[in-house]
C-alpha cells in the first residue's frame, strides 16, 4: 500500500552487471551493504548510509562467484559473514562452499570451507548451492544449503571460533 514502505529506483541497469538475488548486511546507524550474485564471475555491492533510501552505484567486489547463490549475516559482534562458492567461472563449479568474514564489507577473508573440493573425486555433479543462514539468539550461526541437488544439509557453528 506504500504507507509503510517505499520503492527505490533500480540499483543497476543490468548491462554492466547481471546481478540477482541480493543479500543485505546491516552495519548500524543506517549503513547497509547489498551484495549480489552475478553472471560476471564476481559478487557485486551497493552501499547505503540512509537506511536504504538511496544507494551507491553497483560496483565489483574482490569475491569470485560462479553465478551461484550467496547469503550473508551481520553478526552480533559487528563482523559480516558470507557463505558462497569462491570460484569465478560463470556457471562454473559450485564447490567448494565456503565462509568469508569481513570487518568492513570491503576486505573479505575466506575462513572455512564447509564443503571442500575433495582430492581424487570426480567433480561432475558435485554441487553445494543455494545457501541461507541466520544467527540465532544464542550467537550460533545456522546454515542450510542444497547438497548435490538431491537433499539439504544443515550446519551449526560458533562464529567466535572463525578467524
Stretches found by the model and what they are:
Residues 1-163:
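Asp-box/BNR beta-propeller blade signature and adjacent active/binding-site loops
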